Amino acid sequence: MSALQRKNFKDTYPIYELTLAKTQTRFDSVDQILERLSQAIADHPKATEIAHFDHYAHTESVDGSIAEDILAVKNLIFCFGWELPSPDPVAVRPRSIGITERQDDFVVNFMHAPNPVAQQSMEDWVTALANH
């Protein structure tokens, strides 16, 4: 299993990404992973789930481009939002965790959270998807 990697998407957006071989997780589908992450949000005292978004279906519906190796993609949209010290945090809320299925693996990723507690929660949720 690869470790949670930090990288910059388009040289600007800091994201964290975990690539899980299908043999390294107990989950068989994007929907199963989505449900597990939904439960983690439900269990968190400050997080609120907002929506599930089928990014693959949306991109198909607008005749968009999808890489050939991508089989399914969904986003789990949620918010921690326990403080509003200024208007600035609103620009990076709500949060989203993306789940992409390819032939042999799942890629789970999210944008860096400015709040360290939120960041650690998302890291914990995502890394817990791996078999231990």
Residue spans of the language-model regions?
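Short, surface-exposed coil-to-beta transition loops
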Residues: 91-95
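Short, flexible, solvent-exposed loop/turn segments with mixed acidic/basic and small polar residues
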Residues: 6-11, 66-67, 96-101
